[in-house]
């Protein structure tokens, strides 16, 4: 059995749908929201790599590295906000984010 472009695109679509479901079902926990956003970026990266491979173009794979860099910065900032929220409120509830002043 060979893996075709459709297999990779369906995998990307399933990962993307799973992350959207995770965002809509759990809007309270900041860690779950960050993980769902990272899963969404992983789905997009999977599609970029699949198209890049099957079209024989390296631009998609290069663009994935830029997306990974932005995702790492996003995760670092999100976890820093999470640590600040937990220190101040002893909770990681998203509803308490509006109480942070700085």
Curated annotation (Swiss-Prot):
The keyword Transcription does not apply. Pfam families: Oxidored_q2 (PF00420). It comes from the Bacteria. It is found in: Cell inner membrane. NDH-1 is composed of 14 different subunits. Subunits NuoA, H, J, K, L, M, N constitute the membrane sector of the complex. Its EC number is 7.1.1.-. NDH-1 shuttles electrons from NADH, via FMN and iron-sulfur (Fe-S) centers, to quinones in the respiratory chain. The immediate electron acceptor for the enzyme in this species is believed to be ubiquinone. Couples the redox reaction to proton translocation (for every two electrons transferred, four hydrogen ions are translocated across the cytoplasmic membrane), and thus conserves the redox energy in a proton gradient. One of its GO terms (biological process) is ATP synthesis coupled electron transport. The lineage of its organism: Bacteria, Pseudomonadati, Pseudomonadota, Betaproteobacteria, Burkholderiales. It catalyses: a quinone + NADH + 5 H(+)(in) = a quinol + NAD(+) + 4 H(+)(out). GO terms for cellular component: NADH dehydrogenase complex; plasma membrane. Gene3D superfamilies: 1.10.287.3510. The keyword Transmembrane applies. One of its GO terms (molecular function) is quinone binding. The gene is nuoK. Keywords: Cell inner membrane, Cell membrane, Membrane, NAD, Quinone, Translocase, Transmembrane, Transmembrane helix, Transport, Ubiquinone. It is a multi-pass membrane protein. This is NADH-quinone oxidoreductase subunit K. The chain crosses the membrane at residues 5-25, 31-51, 62-82. NCBIfam families: PRK05715.1-2, PRK05715.1-3, PRK05715.1-5. Its main location: membrane.
């Amino acid at each position: 059995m060979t893996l075709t472009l459709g297999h990779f695109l369906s995998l990307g679509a399933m990962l993307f749908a799973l992350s959207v479901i995770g965002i809509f079902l759990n809007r309270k926990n900041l860690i779950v929201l960050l993980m769902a956003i990272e899963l969404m970026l992983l789905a997009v990266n999977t599609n970029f790599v699949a198209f890049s491979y099957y079209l024989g173009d390296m631009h998609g794979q290069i663009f994935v590295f830029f997306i990974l860099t932005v995702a790492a910065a996003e995760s670092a900032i999100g976890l820093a906000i999470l640590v600040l929220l937990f220190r101040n409120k002893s909770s990681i509830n998203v509803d308490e984010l509006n109480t942070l002043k700085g």
